[in-house]
Each structure stands twice: as C-alpha cells, then as structure tokens.
Amino acid sequence: MAITTIRMRRARSAFTFSAESSSISVSAHQTPLRMTTQYWLVKSEPEAYAWADLVRDGRTAWTGVRNYAARIHLNAMQRGDRVMFYESVTTKAVVGIAEVTKPAFPDPTADDPGWVAVELKADTPLAHPVTLEQIKTDPSLAKMTLLRQGRLSVTPLTRAEFDRIVKLGA
C-alpha cells in the first residue's frame, strides 16, 4: 500500500492520500509554515510606546501600522521570529530584542479588517543601544532597509544584520 503525504507551504494541515483505497485524510496536527527564523526591526516613538513599556507589559499587540509595505512584513512574521526594537525620533537607536509570539491577526484598532497586528514579547535589552549613527557608519549594515526606507515602521533584517547589531549592543 502506497501512502503519500503532501505538505502544502501555506496549509496548516498535512494531507495523506492512499492510492490503494483512493481516500484522502486530513491530519489534526499543525504543520509549520517554515523551519527557519526570520529577523525584523520595528520602530516606535518612545513617547508613544517605548522599550521600557514592552518590558513592563511583557508582551503587546503591535497595532496601528498603516503602511502597505509594513503590512506585508507583518503578514510574513511567524511565532518565534526575532525582532529588533528601535526607538525613533529622540533615541534613534536599537534598544532591545523582542520575539513574535502570535503571527498576524486583524488589527483591533483598525476599521478595515485588512490591517493586521502581531503580538510581541520583550526578550533581551541591549547592554548598549545601537544608534542610527553607528548603523550608518558600519559597512556590514550599509544595505539595511532602515537606511533605504527610513520611514517604514516594520522592516526585514538579514541574519547577518541581526547578529551584527547584537554584537554592537553587547
């Protein structure tokens, strides 16, 4: 008896097809969408929501994002992804590391259900904030989306960029 298991990239269930009985069954377990961690940077004005607020709260829904490019990034975030927390305007520095604990869901602060939020939890503060000036002058960070699309509030990071910021902040 030949049994084939098909895992669909976007599907959350595994489908099993048995050629002998021509039957299809759907398993009850959840399958991961991907096996690798992704890395992100989120920006917040400290007067609105600072790193200290996330540490105090433990976790928060990252709401209020109303930029189409940032929405694409929020939709791509998955549980376990690592997130650099950047305080903009006054601090202008990466100050901590958070983790995605809940992937994209409808933003409760939006009238349009197309806008999404993710849930983040505070993980690790950086011992030394990594300033925008440090990022701009570090050759290994020269291609960061933060530098090319400075007004974007949610941006992807490469693993190398993430690791370099961690090293600079140690």
Language-model segments: which ranges?
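N-terminal, intrinsically disordered, basic low-complexity segments enriched in Arg/Pro/Ser/Thr
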Residues: 1-34
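Compositionally biased, charged N-terminal/linker segments
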Residues: 25, 29-79, 169-170
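Contiguous surface segments at macromolecular interaction interfaces
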Residues: 32-47, 107-170
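Short glycine/proline-enriched turns and hinge-like loops at secondary-structure junctions
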Residues: 53, 78, 93-94, 111-113
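Short acidic (Asp/Glu) patches
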Residues: 63-69, 102-109, 139
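Short, charged beta-turn/beta-strand-edge "cap" motif at the junction between a beta-strand
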Residues: 86-92
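Short beta-strand-centered aromatic/proline hotspots
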Residues: 93-103
